[in-house]
């Protein structure tokens, strides 16, 4: 049986994502999950929250975007990317020691490329930025937190012809998702990307 690693920046298991991946990959592939927040206390998780007043421009200039992820109980948290990078490295090492053939990050955030990894490490963001503009010229980007809007506009605007960016947290109910979908239709988006979900 082939083993692949999957790192969530929240807690594992990701019962909202991995079962669908498993169906696509089939029974001959074992997905070994590792959560960056696994084993941390509520206080330790709270310490990873973004600092400051929530201004994404300040964080962008400092170089530490906000990431959002799911906890095991279905709730969600926001984290400052810079604060979780050492924890990501530990999960990479954990999965390497488990004998995985490659590791997939279950996050579309743009991560630095200085992780030490002996197996291929796949970042969905790189795939999306290459593939999505080939599929459509008018793109709808859905991001879970308002503080991510400016970063998403800047990053996706560099690779797409026309970008509409909306905010709706998938972990907080469907109302925001419906409003975002209406905005995408109004703006003529040909495809919708769930960015940082």
Predicted regions span which residues?
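Short active-site oxyanion
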Residues: 2-3, 99-101, 137-140, 189-192
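N-terminal glycine-rich phosphate/adenylate-binding segment common to multiple enzyme folds
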Residues: 75-124, 190-195
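N-terminal glycine-rich anion-binding loop in soluble enzyme alpha/beta folds
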Residues: 1-79, 143-173
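Extended, histidine- and acidic-residue-enriched regions that form the cofactor-binding/catalytic faces
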Residues: 5-9, 14-15, 181-197
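Generic structural signal for hydrophobic
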Residues: 95, 156, 183-184
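Structural motif
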Residues: 43, 86, 170-182
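Conserved mixed alpha/beta catalytic, RNA-binding, or beta-rich assembly cores of soluble enzyme
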Residues: 102-111, 115-174, 178
